[in-house]
Amino acid sequence: MRNNIYTLLLLFLFTSVNAQEYSKLISEADKLYETKNYKMSTDLYNKAFKIESKNPNHLYNGACASSLAGNTKKAFKWLNLSIEKGWTNLKHLNSDTDLENLHSKKEWGKTIEKLEKKLELIEANYDKPLQAELLTILDEDQKYRVQINETQKKFAQDSKEMQDLWKITIQKDSINLLKVKKILDEKGWVGKDKVGAQANSALFLVIQHSDLETQKKYLPMMKEAVTKGNASPGSLALLIDRIEIREGRKQIYGSQIGTNPNTKTQYVLPLIDPDNVDKRRTEVGLGPISDYVKNWNLIWDVEKYKSELSELEKLNK
């Protein structure tokens, strides 16, 4: 029995080390892609996929990097594997400029046909009208926020340009919320098996962008949906964090970012037990907080964060 336990412990440690190495390689490959070093990016994706090749998004990103590096053979290999592992966004696949140099290859038509046939099987039992409605809602929810992200690079937060965009966004959000509440009240939290992953994500995004009372009302429904596989645990974590912060408590997963009114710099809003945040994030399928905060050009230093936490809590009152 002791030998079995020892073997299991070694297996656990080996798996943990491999998982950490995989995440590190993927993160570095992503950085190299962003700096247009596509060959080095491809090399690191290749090393990562020798450890594990199950994540369809990572495989797709690897295909993009290898395509841009001119390695079409590897690009098709990873692209087809991503489809086998669950990549289903045909619209994005057809429009992705990273893959343009694959279009002239005979394998391209076969790859598109492969995904189309897979989608036919997957979508055979879809609620097509509901899917179309949710995809429209998703587009309305995201397109103005994309514009906001682009505009704030050029104009101040209190500029007329930003104020006008936020006014439109708030109006669209209120319309979308009425539609989503009707869907949730009549049909429940509809899973991706009925409308597809993209359309399913619209439910979360609209609730995430709604008022506190609405968020609290639909939180139990989303929790139940997660247990049934109809909603993402990571998305639920983001909703929980937002509610916790809005109600004056510390967040759990570190997903909510605030702006210091004095320095105008951004920071991770008050967080419980910062030392173990990555453990909690891993449990719900979220990546390391050090990678997450880079989206706001922040560097995660847990000791520095803990030393500043009492002051950050004052800012949030």
Which residue stretches match the model-derived regions?
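Preference for long, solvent-exposed alpha-helical segments and helix-linker "stalks"
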Residues: E84-A202, H209-E213, I240
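Start-of-helix register in tetratricopeptide repeats
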Residues: S23, N57, K91-H92
